[in-house]
Amino acid sequence: MVTDSAVTAPAGTESSVPAGLARSWLLVPGSADGLATRAGASGADVVVVDLEDGVAAADKGRARRALVAVADAGLRPWVRIGDAASDEWRTDVALLRGRDLVAGVVLAKVETPEHVRRTVDALDGALPIVALVESARGIEAALEIAEAPGVVRLAFGSGDFRRDTGAADDPLALLYARSRLVSTSRAAGLPGPVDGPTVRREPAVLMDASRHAASLGMTGRLCLREEQVDAVNAALSPTGDELAWAFDVLDTLERCGIRDGSDLPRIARARAICGAAEAFGIEADAAAVHISDYAS
């Protein structure tokens, strides 16, 4: 049982991966037992203390007190709060306003840029916002939401989107929604969006879903359990072989220069791979052998 007494967080366990690059976003209910330990030791790039759907109505107050206790223990997780049209939202922003409790806010059920603006204004612009898009209205307003001041990333609430639209839990059925979030994120100058979670527990299902998300241009995923984190991080990270390819491309560019316009996409991809690998602490595969695209 979560109590309001002081808790001690594990030392040295918070991720240094910035939110714009974060792959794994672990949702931990604010009412969960051992919240500070889970938040500090999960291995996720970002831990999100859930005050919204993951917490029963009767436990909301206890979850908010637990979030404060986590902050008192020295951790700064993100927090998912109620949607901007709800009474819970008012209570959540009142808790956060003017206090150094969290690193950022995942705003639930965003359907219009006004939902973001209300939240940013209520928090005096002090916290970055990940806008969780979970409905047909939200998907169709995705560009305006992405361009709202304060938004640093979009995320896909796939479960609620399926409930809203009647879509199946199938990659093809959700292809439009995911692709629209990718495209609008790019158009708004944001990083790739965060995909919704995999509910099923089979590791192969999780890995396939994560690779599918990556193939569309999504660069993060919500996780529901700690055991999902490693697979999500692996699926959304450059491999050692890919990093070796990127080094080869950039090295050859330095020696030979650009031959034609078709080189530019490869160079951009190589630089993106190197940047992500540096953030994630990934080293090139020394055994990888690549033949330069520019070699004479």
PLM regions with names:
Residues M1-S296:
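Expand to "…catalyze enediolate/carbanion chemistry for C-C bond making/breaking, isomerization
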